Amino acid sequence: MNPLKKKEKGVGISGGKDSLTLLYTLKEILGENRKIEIMGITIDEGIKGYRDESIKNARELCDSLGIKHYIYTFKEHAKEMDEIMKNTRSDPCSYCGVFRRWILNKACKELEIDVLAIGHNLDDTVQTLQMNIMRNEPLRIARFRPSGGIVENEDFIPRIRPLFNIPEREIVAYALYKGINFYNSECPYAGQALRNPIRIFINNMEKDYPGIKFRMLKSYLSMLDTIKIPEKMKIEKCEICKENSSNKTCKRCQFLKELRNS
């Protein structure tokens, strides 16, 4: 990497409390550094009455901070969630997560972004950990790191999660204190997702056993060094979209094929 080249830092922003707090804080910390430019990237999943509203909050903060804001859509690069959910009873987060990650990586490459910051908080982290354990997906546990990943490749833009150990309620308190105008409604498909009962379970455990979320996080971090990663993970180019994939066809293109045939 050219040390004289200006560094581009992307922040994935939905318009919610976590991503806008992250954007605000990074701007406070890095805003005077002329060698670093911060950009906001929003993914519009095509959920009417939800994402179209939260985008307004994302745009408002970017404008007030003087940050460039880019919007990428499922309609352009995948299929809108409202259309998907008309024809399937599957976990909506499965489709949404795959499409969003694919689009974010593509957006970062197009915008020449060096690092992408994501607003996952402590609650998100332990919920994701528990989901991956229940699905018996150790490699997903290994991939979901505070920074970086398990494979270094120039086509995979590194991600960082600066809020990974901060409880959701503290982020809400900070956002309110700073006067950050965030969108506070829940995704209309959240109740159909596996994450929802896991979130309820962990929150109930936290009430009965205060501090359990932090203990889960500590356990998760210790797992990272014990999960066996294949020495040479083969990275291929998807035969359809030509993006990086661990298989001949990436998950995004597999999903699109399934949806077309359903």
Where are the regions a protein language model picked out?
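ATP-dependent adenylation/nucleotidyltransferase module used to activate substrates
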Residues: M1-P146, N165-K178, C250
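Cys/His-rich microdomains that often coordinate metals
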Residues: H69, N244-S246, K257
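Catalytic subdomain that performs nucleotidyl-dependent activation
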Residues: D123-K207, S262
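Small/polar glycine-rich anion-binding or flexible loop at a beta-alpha turn
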Residues: P188-Q192, L217-S222, M233-K237
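An accessory alpha-helical subdomain
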Residues: F201-Y220
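Short, flexible, mixed-charge glycine/proline-rich loop motifs
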Residues: L224-K234, I240-S245
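Short cysteine-rich clusters marking metal-coordination/redox-active sites
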Residues: K237-C241, C250-C253
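Short Cys/His-rich micro-motifs in 6-15 aa windows
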Residues: R252-S262
